[in-house]
Structure formats: C-alpha cells, structure tokens
Regions:
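Short, charged, amphipathic alpha-helix that recurs within catalytic cores of restriction-modification
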Residues: 85-102, 110-112
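Domain-level recognition of nuclease-like catalytic cores that cleave nucleotide substrates
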Residues: 2-3, 7, 108-158
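Active-site-adjacent loop/helix micro-motif of nuclease/hydrolase catalytic cores
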Residues: 52, 81-91, 122-123
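A structure-centric signal for secondary-structure junctions around beta-strands
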Residues: 56, 69-71, 109
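Alpha-helix termini
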Residues: 64-67, 97-105
C-alpha cells in the first residue's frame, strides 16, 4: 500500500507532500500515528501541498497494520469551528488528488477525523447525517489545549 501511494504521489507531481514526521499540530492541538512494530505508516501534507486550489483538510495518514488491515485518515485540526472542519474534510474527500491516491491505496477503513476544541459545539450537522452524505466514518475528537490524539486508537477492536 505505502509504495503504491508513493508511486501515485510521484505520478501526480506531489511526492514532496510526503512528511517524514507522523505528528501534526495546529491551534495547540495535535494528532499522531504510532504504528505497531510490524505496521507501516505514511503522512501526506494536504493543506497547500497535495491540494492548493480549494478548501482542504490539514493532512492525510495511511496506515497498513498488516496485508489485510489498511486504513486511511483524513484529518482536520480545528479550534471551535466544527462545521468548517466538516466542510474541509468533505472537500478533500471529493478532490481528484485524494480520490486518485485512495483508489491505489485500497484502504479497508476510511476515516474523517475532526480534532476540535473541547468547547466546540458539535451537534450540527449530526455525525450520522454527515457520514451518510459522504460515505465515510466520521470521528470528532474534542481535545484540551496541548493534547495529542493517536490515530492508532481508532484501529483497535472495541
């Protein structure tokens, strides 16, 4: 999965968008991906790199836990503006660059993750309505300032 994503990035002239660091921080909140010992992960900078021509989310993570367990995470780090975060996630999901990459990656689970302030009002639109409209799972993660959420938590069995 990771090598096919890198090939696609090179094909569309976006290979410089790959980040060597699996952590992203903005507005005093953060996200990271800690792969398992045999897992492989890749972070792509979306904002002003993979996508420049429209609203977009901050970054994109791909995580291959095993041959059959492949995950994609669209991530937007936001303060209180929950609805704008969802607009950015939706716009990114529908952008041709993202569609091309996710097509070659073939994740078994695709997540949209909005990291927001713990004080953000997240009742509209409702999570289920957004998921139905966008055909992707949505996780809204309210964080305190200076907290970092590990995306690998979403891959663990409940």
């Amino acid at each position: 999965m990771i090598s096919s994503i890198r090939q696609k990035l090179a094909e569309i002239g976006k290979n410089t968008c790959e980040s060597q660091v699996l952590v992203a921080q903005e507005k005093s909140k953060g996200v990271k991906l800690t792969p398992s010992s045999n897992g492989k992960a890749l972070k792509i900078k979306v904002d002003d790199c993979l996508i420049k021509d429209t609203q977009r989310c901050d970054c994109l993570y791909f995580y291959q836990q095993s041959k059959s367990k492949r995950h994609a995470f669209l991530v937007e780090l936001k303060g209180n503006n929950y609805t704008h975060a969802l607009d950015q996630l939706e716009s990114t999901k529908n952008h041709p660059n993202y569609v091309g990459i996710v097509t070659v990656a073939k994740p078994i689970k695709e997540w949209a993750v909005a990291i927001v302030s713990e004080k953000a009002k997240t009742n509209r639109p409702k999570k289920e309505e957004w998921e139905d409209a966008n055909k992707v799972r949505l996780r809204v993660i309210p964080l305190k300032d200076d907290e970092i959420f590990d995306l690998s938590e979403l891959t663990k069995p409940i």
